[in-house]
């Protein structure tokens, strides 16, 4: 169980999925793709904010944040918390950290705990370890770095003056969904989809 359940469940009722097909333009009642025209009563654009802006002809796309996710393995039981940790004092490069295998044991082998940590700025592993030790109140010297993933355009930047939610309806029968229509998170993306579905029904 984990984030993969989102995509697996979303795909269950779908019978016509086109792979390796690029959407080239949007029109009233249809989209033009690399393999021809696909018609529909409603068009929902659900892609990254830059591609979305290009498809709907927006003059400005949201600015994007880069992020790095760090995965550390440690002995099971060293951390038992199941909640996301946030350093409100910003005393290091980490914005949040969570022992994800405490929520779903499928993320780590028996006897181990997997900690997932996110940084926005460039940081060395030693800086991350020091900040993790501060946040979790444990020594991190024996933690093993499993992997790290750098994503150049991971989340849209939510400006201070920006409303919490933006409209998902672009015009009649055209909707735009994604975390750029709300809070930059999986929750924001899912929420925008729900708002669009409610307006369509």
Name each region found by the language model.
Residues 14, 40-41, 171:
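Short, well-ordered alpha-helix to beta-strand connector turns
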Residues 22, 48-49, 151, 179:
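Flexible loop residues that form catalytic
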Residues 24-136:
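Mid-domain catalytic core of redox enzymes
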């Amino acid at each position: 169980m984990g984030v993969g359940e989102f995509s697996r469940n979303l795909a269950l009722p779908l019978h016509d999925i086109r792979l390796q097909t690029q959407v080239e333009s949007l029109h009233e009642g249809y989209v033009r793709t690399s393999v021809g025209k696909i018609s529909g009563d409603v068009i929902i654009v659900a892609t990254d904010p830059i591609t979305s802006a290009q498809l709907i002809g927006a003059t400005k796309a949201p600015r994007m944040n880069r992020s790095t996710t760090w995965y550390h393995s440690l002995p099971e039981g060293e951390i038992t918390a199941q909640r996301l940790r946030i350093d409100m004092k910003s005393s290091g490069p980490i914005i949040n950290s969570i022992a994800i295998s405490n929520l779903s044991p499928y993320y780590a082998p028996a006897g181990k705990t997997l900690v997932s940590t996110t940084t926005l700025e460039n940081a060395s592993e030693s800086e991350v370890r020091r900040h993790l030790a501060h946040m979790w109140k444990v020594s991190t010297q024996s933690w093993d770095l499993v992997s790290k993933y750098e994503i150049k355009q991971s989340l849209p930047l939510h400006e201070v003056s920006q409303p919490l939610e933006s409209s998902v309806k672009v015009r009649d029968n055209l909707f735009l969904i994604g975390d750029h229509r709300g809070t930059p998170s999986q929750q924001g993306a899912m929420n925008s989809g729900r708002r669009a579905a409610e307006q369509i029904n």
